[in-house]
Amino acid sequence: MARTTPIERYRNIGICAHVDAGKTTTTERVLFYTGLSHKIGEVHDGAATTDWMVQEQERGITITSAAVTTFWRGMDAQFTEHRINIIDTPGHVDFTIEVERSLRVLDGAVVVFCGSSGVEPQSETVWRQADKYRVPRLVFVNKMDRAGADFERVVKQIRTRLGATCVPIQLNIGAEENFTGVIDLIKMKAINWNEADQGMTFTYEEIPASLAAKAAEMHEYLVEAAAEASDELMDKYLEEGTLSEDEIKKALRQRTINNEIVLATCGSAFKNKGVQAVLDAVVEFLPAPVDVPPIKGIDDDEQEVERPSDDNAPFAALAFKIATDPFVGTLTFIRVYSGVLESGSGVYNSVKQKRERIGRIVQMHANDRTELKEVRAGDIAAAIGLKEVTTGDTLCDPDHKVILERMEFPEPVITIAVEPKSKADQDKMGIALQKLAAEDPSFRVETDEESSQTLISGMGELHLDIIVDRMRREFGVECNVGKPQVAYRETIRASVEAEGKFVRQSGGRGQFGHVWLKLEPNEEGAGYEFINAIVGGVVPREFIPAVDKGIQEQMKNGVLAGFPVLDVKVTLFDGSYHDVDSNEMAFKIAGSMGFKKGALEANPVLLEPCMKVEVTTPENYMGDVVGDLNRRRGLIEGMDDGFGGIKIVHAVVPLSEMFGYATDLRSATQGRASYSMEFLKYSDAPQNIAKAIIESRS
């Protein structure tokens, strides 16, 4: 079967945004205009096509990123048909992992901002993630019909707060309730969308006289930005004072793909104005898979290799999301980087080192699907029938093995105990948690050996709320939830030498292991380091890995209060052995004893996770917000001015003090403040708090 759409006409894009910027409504309009979704779903009715999990519909926020394939011929049917694969990404801070995951597999992104609230703390997080993966992007300033909407102010914020060179290619005509349409600053025409057919058709009109001067000035800025793409264009621009429409578009496209500029559009998705032009901009300015550098990976010989976006290259794809579907079981969403994959064929999972067979391949629309015979370079689709895959695995041609870049997932910071309400729920809970953990690498499940409770850990309270909620809805498991626990850690602050000696003579063959260890604090974040400094074979070589293992096991179990130990450098420098009685077990125990003894003498401290917190609040609640953060042992690091009397407070606060913060902040500010929180670092817990925790654990 030949390729139906040439790869140059593919656009793999994400739509990213802050929680309330109107991203889901924007995606809905995209589906509507691309002719796939005939009734526009509104988020406030809980009926949007991409928000297909029930909780999303209830909470009105997007949680799982669904991949949707659409086709677009242009607002004026001016293009040959392009295939646009859209990955919907969540904007809530507890789900930044989903955003990271989708940015990995995209070639470009549309970032949606709210016309009145502009750049919010969460938008900065998303923007930094897009910078990290060097994703070319366009900006859509939405909600231009809202009170306080101001396109130019948001553009200015993007320049100052996000440090991007933002080039508007549109100007709004009117704002708030007078918002009627936009000016296309490249064509220098006003666009008037037809309200009778929900904006499916439009007319070009002359620019309103009151905006002519402003539009001319912005057109000039845009042409200058285009001219900077190359010396030839710059020379032409300086000589003739202008460039052709075609030259402008090509140059802006090139600079967007190089991440030098960010083009800005505006509109109101809700009022059916603007999204049509965003789709045109996606086609004109965002890259096709062949316009971005080929993905790199590591082959069997540990050599770096590239996989170009080409059907003739060996097959390679990345599994970027696992979802459980009530009808077909597990769906593995994959981005195909190179080659062709036919349904029913075998693939190799190079991360797990296992062969698997793909049952069926389906292309997802927001909530229905078409079956495909094959997928090719550039495609995004879902595979059915894969058993062993987890998020971030590479699937490749068994004869050309490669591991594409691994995704790095953050460590969870909050843990709660869950117990099934009845015996019947017990077995179902295990299966449910296993499936949910395969879908979401930032969520962990473990059993506490002492209390034999099941513990689940995640990125925040909302994250775990939703997991518990999904267990109830999707798997019918009712469970009781314990109080949240913080993931404390331990470390040492001094260097010591310590002896670990394990001798057991009780008739028959004895046990003998003896080591001397030097324990030193390692740099923050450097983790555990083991150095073998044995000379002259005083500890035989075959027992050294056992010593290392014993130390690591003891580190996992902690020395003060049973929390894992971080950032320690251990040197094995001396010891002795017995010809007959020494074995691996004895040296493992000796290593563990030596570490515990040493760590207790090396000024051990308890570490608590500290979060970077940003609160956006109206100025009149500022005092209350700061006072409350101080009460929570927060360290105020600074304040910025937002627009319209809004203040942004930056603070570092211990996680243990942040439980229930969302509710407290809402009631203190009558729901007008919002906050974002992400893990920053581990810091020493104050003595009184450490003492209380150690006593409660002993």
Curated annotation (Swiss-Prot):
Major localization listed first in the record, in broad terms: cytoplasm
A single Gene Ontology CC term: cytoplasm
Family annotation (InterPro entries): EFG_II (IPR041095), EFG_III (IPR009022), EFG_III/V (IPR035647), EFG_IV (IPR047872), EFG_V (IPR035649), EFG_V-like (IPR000640), EFTu-like_2 (IPR004161), G_TR_CS (IPR031157)
Protein function: Catalyzes the GTP-dependent ribosomal translocation step during translation elongation. During this step, the ribosome changes from the pre-translocational (PRE) to the post-translocational (POST) state as the newly formed A-site-bound peptidyl-tRNA and P-site-bound deacylated tRNA move to the P and E sites, respectively. Catalyzes the coordinated movement of the two tRNA molecules, the mRNA and conformational changes in the ribosome.
Record-level Gene Ontology MF annotations: GTP binding; GTPase activity; guanosine tetraphosphate binding; translation elongation factor activity
Positions bound to GTP: 17-24, 88-92, 142-145
Keywords, alphabetical: Cytoplasm, Elongation factor, GTP-binding, Nucleotide-binding, Protein biosynthesis
Top-level taxon of origin: Bacteria
Pfam families listed in its UniProt record: EFG_C (PF00679), EFG_III (PF14492), EFG_IV (PF03764), GTP_EFTU (PF00009), GTP_EFTU_D2 (PF03144)
Assigned protein family: Belongs to the TRAFAC class translation factor GTPase superfamily. Classic translation factor GTPase family. EF-G/EF-2 subfamily.
Species annotation: Shewanella sp. (strain MR-4)
Protein name: Elongation factor G 1
An annotated GO BP: ribosome disassembly
Occurrences of domain tr-type G (ranges): 8-290
Subcellular location: Cytoplasm
Transmembrane spans: none
Gene3D superfamilies, alphabetized: 3.30.230.10, 3.30.70.240, Elongation Factor G (Translational Gtpase), domain 3, P-loop containing nucleotide triphosphate hydrolases, Translation factors
Gene designation: fusA1
